[in-house]
Every structure is written in C-alpha cells, then in structure tokens.
Amino acid sequence: MSEELSAATSYTEDDFYCPVCQEVLKTPVRTAACQHVFCRKCFLTAMRESGIHCPLCRGSVTRRERACPERALDLENIMRRFSGSCRCCSKKIKFYRMRHHYKSCKKYQDEYGVSSVIPNFKISQDSVRSSNRSETSASDNTETYQEDTSSSGHPTFKCPLCQESNFTRQRLLDHCNSNHLFQIVPVTCPICVSLPWGDPSQITRNFVSHLNQRHQFDYGEFVNLQLDEETQYQTAVEESFQVNM
C-alpha cells in the first residue's frame, strides 16, 4: 500500500480484503461486537450456513445483524480515495475498482482460473453427448471430478484438495471454506470441467478463491446446459415476449 494511505489512516492493505473470499471487499459490512469486516454477500452466506457466529472469530452476531448487517461506509470511502497494487500485475488501482480491473487483467485470470465472462455456447446437444462418450483425456478428467447427481437432482463433485466426494456445488463451497481456506494448491476445478465450455487443461492456482468468485450459483438454474446456443437464444426471446405481453 502507498505510504500516503498508511500515514493517513490506521488501515493496512489486508483490511481491504475479505477474510472469507480472500478478495478485495465488495459492499463491506462490519460486525458490531468484534468489528470484523466482510463482503456483504460473503457475510450473509456465512450466516445462512453457520448461524449466529462471526465467520472469522466465532464471536456473537445479533439477529438483526444476521439479516441486515451494517455497512462499513468509512471503509468504502477510503477504498474510493486510495489505491493498492493488483496482486498479479502490480498495477496501481483504486481499491473500489480492483474487482473491475480483475475482469480485464490477463495475469490475474491466468493465476486464479477461468475468465469471469462465460463464453457463448458453441457445443450442440449432439456434440455434448458425443463428448461424454469420448475416451479422450478431457473426458477422463471430467469423470475424475464429477460424480453422480444427488438426491436433489444436482450434480455432485469430488474435492480436488482432499478427494472427499459426493459434494453438491454449495456443499463443496462450504466444505472448502471450512477446511481448505488457506490451502493454495494448483488443481483443476471440477465444476468448471463439468460445464459445456469447461477446459480440462485450465489450472486454478487458488481453488477456494476461485469457488467463491465463480461458483456462487448453479448455472443449471439459469440455462439448460444440454441446449445449443441458438435454442438458448430462441427460448430467451420467447420468455421475454411472454413477460412483456
């Protein structure tokens, strides 16, 4: 961090990073009792999963905080005024713009996994089926990590960090945040590999950070992964037409 920021405030650069997702804070919120700061989304997710404790120190959190945490507006203002270095390319960026910078920083994307922009569908239903039957190294890699579906109908995956299996996307995310938060080992993301646009050769250097950034929702809830691009487009047009009638 610049000397100007260190002299002007009592904050260090680490204070601008969320202890849950390990990324620059997005809509920071602060706990009343222990004064720890998190991304709002990370905090609410932790409250939904773990209940009444601070995700960092296990301190108490009130019922009101769990539903509506207090914004850390002082920290937001400082993030708008001062800059820090991109962890990959070292370019100086205002802290509040850092996440936007990551979307165009090739070094960051090479380090932490797939691009934040999902490519257009270019795989037809037939080619997906054919690919699933193929005995290439790519399909072997997919089978290594993706398993059967759970009783809820969601696909399940094997954790590449400990090989424990039968995790849904959400359970894998929770498991890794609880057990592997500070374990940084180059692995292949099993969720990415399972998607039509997944690249089995893509290595993710910080798997837990990658999960928190890229896999906060199930893609299957928003798109039919078995349909090709043209069918997806036509479906979206028809649904939009129905909504606006």
Curated annotation (Swiss-Prot):
<keyword id="KW-0862">Zinc</keyword>
<feature type="domain" description="UIM">
    <location>
        <begin position="225"/>
        <end position="243"/>
    </location>
</feature>
<feature type="modified residue" description="Phosphothreonine">
    <location>
        <position position="142"/>
    </location>
</feature>
<dbReference type="GO" id="GO:0061630">
    <property type="term" value="F:ubiquitin protein ligase activity"/>
</dbReference>
<feature type="zinc finger region" description="C2H2-type 2">
    <location>
        <begin position="187"/>
        <end position="215"/>
    </location>
</feature>
<keyword id="KW-0238">DNA-binding</keyword>
<keyword id="KW-0808">Transferase</keyword>
<dbReference type="InterPro" id="IPR034734">
    <property type="entry name" value="ZF_C2HC_RNF"/>
</dbReference>
<dbReference type="GO" id="GO:0008270">
    <property type="term" value="F:zinc ion binding"/>
</dbReference>
<keyword id="KW-0879">Wnt signaling pathway</keyword>
<feature type="binding site">
    <location>
        <position position="105"/>
    </location>
    <ligand>
        <name>Zn(2+)</name>
    </ligand>
</feature>
<keyword id="KW-0597">Phosphoprotein</keyword>
<keyword id="KW-0677">Repeat</keyword>
<dbReference type="GO" id="GO:0010792">
    <property type="term" value="P:DNA double-strand break processing involved in repair via single-strand annealing"/>
</dbReference>
<dbReference type="InterPro" id="IPR013083">
    <property type="entry name" value="Znf_RING/FYVE/PHD"/>
</dbReference>
<keyword id="KW-0863">Zinc-finger</keyword>
<feature type="binding site">
    <location>
        <position position="89"/>
    </location>
    <ligand>
        <name>Zn(2+)</name>
    </ligand>
</feature>
<dbReference type="GO" id="GO:0000724">
    <property type="term" value="P:double-strand break repair via homologous recombination"/>
</dbReference>
<dbReference type="GO" id="GO:0016055">
    <property type="term" value="P:Wnt signaling pathway"/>
</dbReference>
<dbReference type="GO" id="GO:0003697">
    <property type="term" value="F:single-stranded DNA binding"/>
</dbReference>
<comment type="function">
    <text>E3 ubiquitin-protein ligase involved in DNA damage response by promoting DNA resection and homologous recombination. Recruited to sites of double-strand breaks following DNA damage and specifically promotes double-strand break repair via homologous recombination. Two different, non-exclusive, mechanisms have been proposed.</text>
</comment>
<feature type="binding site">
    <location>
        <position position="101"/>
    </location>
    <ligand>
        <name>Zn(2+)</name>
    </ligand>
</feature>
<keyword id="KW-0234">DNA repair</keyword>
<feature type="zinc finger region" description="RING-type">
    <location>
        <begin position="18"/>
        <end position="58"/>
    </location>
</feature>
<keyword id="KW-0479">Metal-binding</keyword>
<keyword id="KW-0832">Ubl conjugation</keyword>
<dbReference type="Pfam" id="PF13923">
    <property type="entry name" value="zf-C3HC4_2"/>
</dbReference>
<feature type="zinc finger region" description="C2HC RNF-type">
    <location>
        <begin position="86"/>
        <end position="105"/>
    </location>
</feature>
<keyword id="KW-0227">DNA damage</keyword>
<protein>
    <recommendedName>
        <fullName>E3 ubiquitin-protein ligase RNF138</fullName>
        <ecNumber>2.3.2.27</ecNumber>
    </recommendedName>
</protein>
<keyword id="KW-0833">Ubl conjugation pathway</keyword>
<dbReference type="InterPro" id="IPR052498">
    <property type="entry name" value="E3_ubiq-protein_ligase_RNF138"/>
</dbReference>
<dbReference type="InterPro" id="IPR008598">
    <property type="entry name" value="Di19_Zn-bd"/>
</dbReference>
<feature type="zinc finger region" description="C2H2-type 1">
    <location>
        <begin position="157"/>
        <end position="180"/>
    </location>
</feature>
<keyword id="KW-0158">Chromosome</keyword>
<dbReference type="GO" id="GO:0019901">
    <property type="term" value="F:protein kinase binding"/>
</dbReference>
<dbReference type="Pfam" id="PF18574">
    <property type="entry name" value="zf_C2HC_14"/>
</dbReference>
<feature type="binding site">
    <location>
        <position position="86"/>
    </location>
    <ligand>
        <name>Zn(2+)</name>
    </ligand>
</feature>
<feature type="region of interest" description="Disordered">
    <location>
        <begin position="128"/>
        <end position="154"/>
    </location>
</feature>
<dbReference type="GO" id="GO:0035861">
    <property type="term" value="C:site of double-strand break"/>
</dbReference>
<comment type="pathway">
    <text>Protein modification; protein ubiquitination.</text>
</comment>
<dbReference type="GO" id="GO:1990830">
    <property type="term" value="P:cellular response to leukemia inhibitory factor"/>
</dbReference>
